[in-house]
């Protein structure tokens, strides 16, 4: 993962961690980090990690301030969705993906036969996650995860990941020097976090190692394996861009409403290309990230399978759209709005502070817009009779600023904001998904 240029100093919760790291003298630095590392040993030992592996992996550990900073930059949530999709589904990425489809035609055919997962989706995930292996991340995974723990940035997420990473080293699938990845510990061509690797990675070529770092067959097979076990349905589309009847406000339909495609068609929601739905009995929900101002989609079960890979719906949309482009489809028919102001860190932090004041969110505001914040935004929108898209816009921020918070409100409990790809069990039509690889795509 690249370093974020010209990043602003982070001023709250995790921001103080960055400033504290920079301000501590080297002696304090080392003492605090080593005490933290030693406190991790009992859990690692209980998980079967040998002391020699633990010591070798964490010898001389110091926290990485860049990891703390990057944890606060997740483009799935802080960039307008149109801008995010333009970057991830560029003409160049489509062109390269088509070349990869041709180069690995035999491998992808065997994976389709074995796992039933569409080859275009497998390659699209590869393209979105690491730009086809050219940008897999250059941070030492052990150091990144230990930093997230020892700075308190995302300790709840990172501790089981670190222990799993140590067990991967112990098994011999990869060397410590080669175990590089993202700030969140996501690894290899298709960016598995350690716990997902341990459960779902595949040794496709039979050499005794599940090498997602340097072995493309292993990496792509692992992705197919993970999607299949996440509920992928063979032969089903991920979704369709649709046209809605004039005057119909897609924001007024809950994303949890599942109906057969034939039912949606009966009320005038049809594919933008005029073609019939391939399997009209398949159930779908209406997804309109920008309401009537942008494209609308009917998304099916396979969209939710992609959400297991990354909980951000904008990510799943990027994968689905790139897969369509690789198949020969064109750009979105309806344009994305370009007039939405990108909230600054200070504005995002203020947004969270106001949500907390209204009893919709707990914790300290840090400007990280993750699943808990998005759900709080939706709850507020519902309470005011607004269109429910969960988008923290400047207009909505101004509305919150003008409205005094209710008196004696008990804050709603929320979970720690996790990296973009980490969520909870997928129980609703577009509910947060279970944990998956956690690289934040930047390009």
Roles of regions detected by a PLM:
Residues 49-281, 294-299, 303-323, 327-345, ...:
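Catalytic glycan-binding domains that act on GlcNAc-containing polysaccharides
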Residues 343-348, 356-400:
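Short acidic, glycine/serine/threonine-rich helix-capping segments at coil-helix boundaries
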Residues 28-30:
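Boundary at the C-terminal end of the N-terminal hydrophobic targeting segment
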Residues 32-51, 55:
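Mature N-terminal segment immediately following signal peptide/propeptide cleavage
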Residues 2-16:
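Bacterial N-terminal signal peptides that target proteins for export
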Residues 36-43, 107, 144, 351, ...:
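A general alpha-helix detector
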Residues 331-335, 395, 401-443:
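Proline-rich, low-complexity linker regions of envelope-associated factors in Gram-negative bacteria
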Residues 23-25:
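N-terminal signal peptide c-region/cleavage motif recognized by signal peptidases
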